[in-house]
Amino acid sequence: MHEQEYLTPQGLKKLEDELDFLKSTRRAEVAKRLHEAMEEGEVEENPEYEDAKNEQAFVEGRILTIETILANA
C-alpha cells in the first residue's frame, strides 16, 4: 500500500497536465524516434535507438509515478 499524498490544487493541476502531456505528446514522439532508429538497421550498435529506448523507459516510469501519486492524493 502506498502512502497518502497531499497536493495543493496547483500541484494537482501541474501533475495532471504533465501526465496528459506525457501520454498524448511525449509517448508519440518517443515512439516515432524508436521507429526511425529501427529503420536505420542494426539496433544493437545504434546509439540513437539506445537513447530512444532509455527515453521511453524514463517517460513510462514518469507516467507510472504520476499515476501512483494521483491515485493516492
Regions found by a protein language model. Give the residues of each.
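N-terminal cationic and glycine-rich segments that engage phosphates or anionic surfaces
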Residues: 1-58, 64
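Amphipathic alpha-helical coiled-coil segments
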Residues: 59-73
